[in-house]
Amino acid sequence: MHSYRERLSVPVGWWVLAVVCVVLLGTEVWAGLGGFIPVLTYAVLALIVGAVLVNWSAAVIEVTGGTLRAARATLPLDQVGKVVALDEAQAARLRGPRADPAAHLLLRPYLKRAVYIEVADPASKVPYWLLATRRPAELAAAIQRSHETVG
């Protein structure tokens, strides 16, 4: 049973923008060179842009069974300290000037809000996790609820 699950999928607008960029760049090559090269350019650009967007969409944040999973990383909820839902400005500070290089970050350029999760395990070299999310209040509440039942 999942108490929280969110796929960090790329917004539709980004896919539309990607298609427009591929068409424009491919057209530039076609106008300059003609022949088979533009077809190859369209294909290569589409594959690269598509692979990047699909890769970004693959990340899942999940709170279930006493564990927080963010993409491939896991954190037992009994090692969780303070949990804070961050607005855009707070998240920007922790992504930028106030970032700790040892922190675990799962960020996406199209998600501006995040959740700060303090790692309470003294043996861990990771001071906190910063997870981008569309629903920071829900994620923070799910972590706190699950942490209370585990801890």
Q: Which sequence ranges carry the predicted segments?
A:
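Conserved beta-hairpin
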Residues: 44-84
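Hydrophobic, well-ordered secondary-structure segments
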Residues: 20-21, 47, 62, 116-120, ...
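Non-transmembrane, membrane-adjacent beta-strand/coil modules in membrane-associated proteins
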Residues: 71-130
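Cytosol-/stroma-facing membrane-proximal "stalk/adaptor" domains immediately downstream
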Residues: 132-151
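Pocket-edge structural micro-motifs
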Residues: 6, 119, 133
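N-terminal membrane-targeting/pre-transmembrane regions
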Residues: 1-33, 151
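Short, aromatic-rich membrane-interface segments at the entry and exit
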Residues: 34-42
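Short acidic, gly/pro-rich beta-turn/loop elements at beta-sheet edges
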Residues: 16, 127, 139-141
